[in-house]
């Protein structure tokens, strides 16, 4: 079984083949997801909420992400492994280099950073030094207090254009993947069509190249609240591996996300 790389995902985009991603935080779940064919696993700073019980992702540290990255790495053979860079771990290019290095040494294939134009220098420097970057635009959870809560982004023309411009700039700076979160499907479509690199959506409609969800939402083991853009697949299948297969199949055939999971 060949390993998934950024080149694999680029080929999928060029072929029009949808791919899937999930968060993972330990070897056991990672092994199950990897074995069923999930293409990308993300050690997300969402662990601050779903594992540590915080109200947001801000308390998560680089050491936390590195620990869980090592755990996930030991459980997988095929999936591309991305590690989130947590809040204030990349405020400067120098700080980003130090912390991204630690995450790559922990087993990540790529690091993910939230932000737009202010990140361009950092993205370029990381890429030039052999650290692949996944960018993240739209609802960026580390900026939740700036946004005034977890709110859909890019609904007005000005902000939609800003996000599109930032997506293009991040690709030009060297980003190899882009996550767009909680934006209107029309904006996600424009970004996906404008960029050469693969675009992964969460709460961004069905037109992105790939989809990502938090594993706790997919398996219905969150704290009771499941975001509108997510779906409890365990409820309809009754078994973890079957739930993962159902998620993969619905993304591949275009039935997930449907209109009920999408913002306008």
UniProtKB/Swiss-Prot annotation:
Alphabetically sorted, this entry's keywords are: Cytoplasm, Magnesium, Metal-binding, Pantothenate biosynthesis, Transferase
Tell me where in or outside the cell this protein is found: Cytoplasm
One family from Pfam that matches here is Pantoate_transf
A cellular component term, taken from the record's GO annotations: cytoplasm
Its needed co-factors are: Mg(2+)
EC number of this enzyme:
2.1.2.11
Active-site residues, record numbering mapped to chain: 181 (proton acceptor)
Q: In which pathway does it act?
A: Cofactor biosynthesis; (R)-pantothenate biosynthesis; (R)-pantoate from 3-methyl-2-oxobutanoate: step 1/2
Q: Where does Mg(2+) bind?
A: 45, 84, 114
Which is an annotated GO molecular function term of this record?
magnesium ion binding
Q: Which cysteines are joined by disulfide bonds?
A: none
Record's catalysed reaction(s): 3-methyl-2-oxobutanoate + (6R)-5,10-methylene-5,6,7,8-tetrahydrofolate + H2O = 2-dehydropantoate + (6S)-5,6,7,8-tetrahydrofolate
GO BP term (any one): pantothenate biosynthetic process
Please tell me where this protein is predominantly located.
cytoplasm
According to the record, how does the cofactor bind?
A: Binds 1 Mg(2+) ion per subunit.
Q: Which InterPro entries match?
A: Pantoate_hydroxy_MeTrfase, Pyrv/PenolPyrv_kinase-like_dom, Pyrv_kinase-like_dom_sf
| Record-linked SUPFAM superfamilies | Phosphoenolpyruvate/pyruvate domain (SSF51621)
| Residues bound to 3-methyl-2-oxobutanoate | 45-46, 84, 112
TM ranges: none
Q: What does this protein do?
A: Catalyzes the reversible reaction in which hydroxymethyl group from 5,10-methylenetetrahydrofolate is transferred onto alpha-ketoisovalerate to form ketopantoate.
Q: How would you summarize the oligomeric state and partners of this protein?
A: Homodecamer; pentamer of dimers.
Which family, according to the similarity comment?
A: Belongs to the PanB family.
Q: What is this protein called?
A: 3-methyl-2-oxobutanoate hydroxymethyltransferase
């Amino acid at each position: 079984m060949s390993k998934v790389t950024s080149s694999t995902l680029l080929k999928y985009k060029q072929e029009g083949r949808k791919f899937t991603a999930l968060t993972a935080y330990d070897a056991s779940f990672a092994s199950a997801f990897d074995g069923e064919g999930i293409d990308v696993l993300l050690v997300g700073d969402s662990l601050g909420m779903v594992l540590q019980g915080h109200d947001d992702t801000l308390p998560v540290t680089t050491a936390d992400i590195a620990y869980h990255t090592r755990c996930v790495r030991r459980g997988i053979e095929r999936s591309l492994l991305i590690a989130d860079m947590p809040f204030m771990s990349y405020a400067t290019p120098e700080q980003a280099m130090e912390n991204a290095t630690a995450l790559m040494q922990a087993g990540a294939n790529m690091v993910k950073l939230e932000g737009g134009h202010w990140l361009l220098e950092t993205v370029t420097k990381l890429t030039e030094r052999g650290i692949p970057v996944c960018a993240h635009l739209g609802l960026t959870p580390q900026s939740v207090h700036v946004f005034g809560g977890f709110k859909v982004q890019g609904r007005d023309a000005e902000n939609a254009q800003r996000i599109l411009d930032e997506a293009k700039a991040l690709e030009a700076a060297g980003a190899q993947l882009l996550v767009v979160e909680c934006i209107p499907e029309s904006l996600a479509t424009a970004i996906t069509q404008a960029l050469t690199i693969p675009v992964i959506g969460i709460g961004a409609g069905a037109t992105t190249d790939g989809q990502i969800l938090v594993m706790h939402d997919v398996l219905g083991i969150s704290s009771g609240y499941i975001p509108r853009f997510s779906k409890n697949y365990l409820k309809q299948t009754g078994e973890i591996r079957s739930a993962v297969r159902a998620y993969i199949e619905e993304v591949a055939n275009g039935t997930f996300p449907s209109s009920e999971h999408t913002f306008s």
